[in-house]
UniProtKB/Swiss-Prot annotation:
Keywords: Decarboxylase, Lyase, Pyrimidine biosynthesis. GO terms for biological process: 'de novo' pyrimidine nucleobase biosynthetic process; 'de novo' UMP biosynthetic process. The active site is at K95 (proton donor). Pathway: Pyrimidine metabolism; UMP biosynthesis via de novo pathway; UMP from orotate: step 2/2. It comes from Mycobacterium marinum (strain ATCC BAA-535 / M). One of its GO terms (molecular function) is orotidine-5'-phosphate decarboxylase activity. It comes from the Bacteria. This is Orotidine 5'-phosphate decarboxylase. It holds the Pfam family OMPdecase. Its EC number is 4.1.1.23.
């Protein structure tokens, strides 16, 4: 299988540079006249799968599935399988992070050969970038991707992410370490896009420099959270093709009509299409 970085680049080139979120928040379920149950969750996801067919990347927010226990995970597995059947890359927004054997277990679940394994997964480096090594290695071996939190769109994140770490912000340190990992892998795999990226929020002031990342940049916070699609170009010194804007509520609030959700997604895609320009 081709590495995630190359698959992502191809998907964006053919289907546009947009990541659509599946965030089945209880308030959205109510707005869609669905019960806040596993059955309501499944119905919500069925609508999203149908509406998002043919787009490049879809990002299920794992926490909203976990809330329903085993039944929620069953819905997540089915949703991921259905998205893949439609040719969509699946990014599991799980934000996992731990050490040693526990991190290895997360790696097996999300980047190995389990029913939950996604094309890519988000992770937290709070326990140190080196703690992510088990998952990074499993993801690389299985041609999957990883997005490491660096500078997030929530205002509370700045307290830690903008702290000084030997002359660099913590966010910049994370970006630089991801860049080094991509360089190491590139020496073995050859000149293809890196499969490990970072998360940099659309509303972050003074974002880290990602010009040397060698991988993709997931950009949440577009739409309802205040990030403007037209203002993303050059974020952190990124090349346009590096950026992958992510949007959820701005699109999902158009539901429950499949056609209306899809139309909202297409409007958002039109607004970020300039990021595909060579």
């Amino acid at each position: 299988m081709t590495g995630f970085g190359a698959r992502l680049a191809e998907a964006k080139a053919h289907r546009g540079p947009l990541c659509l979120g599946i965030d089945p928040h209880p308030e959205l379920l109510r707005a869609w006249d669905l019960p806040a149950t596993a059955d309501g969750l499944a119905a919500f996801c069925d609508i999203c799968v149908a509406a998002f067919a043919g787009f490049a990347v879809v990002k299920p927010q794992v926490a909203f599935f976990e809330a329903y226990g085993a039944a929620g995970f069953a819905v997540l597995e089915g949703t991921m399988a259905a998205l893949r059947a439609n040719g969509v890359l699946v990014l599991a927004d799980a934000k996992r992070g731990d050490i040693g054997s526990t991190m290895a277990a997360y790696a097996a679940a999300w980047a190995g050969d389990s029913p939950l394994a996604a094309d890519a997964v988000t992770v937290s480096p709070f326990l140190g970038f080196g703690s992510l090594r088990p998952l990074l290695e499993v993801a690389t071996a299985n041609d999957r991707g990883v997005f490491v939190l660096a500078a997030t769109s929530n205002p509370e994140g700045a307290t830690i992410q903008r702290a000084d770490a030997d002359g660099r912000t913590v966010a910049q340190l994370i970006v630089d370490q991801v860049g080094l990992f991509n360089s190491e892998v590139g020496e073995v795999t050859g000149p293809e896009p890196g499969s490990v990226g970072v998360v940099v929020g659309a509303t972050v002031l003074n974002p880290p420099d990602v010009s040397g990342l060698g991988g993709p940049v997931l950009v949440p916070g577009v739409g309802v959270q205040g990030g403007r699609p037209e203002a993303l170009g050059g974020l952190g010194g990124a090349a346009p093709q590096q950026l992958l804007p992510a949007v959820s509520r701005e699109v999902l609030r158009a539901g429950p009509s499949i056609s209306e959700v899809r139309a909202a997604a297409e409007r958002m895609l039109d607004s970020v299409a300039y990021l595909s320009a060579v």
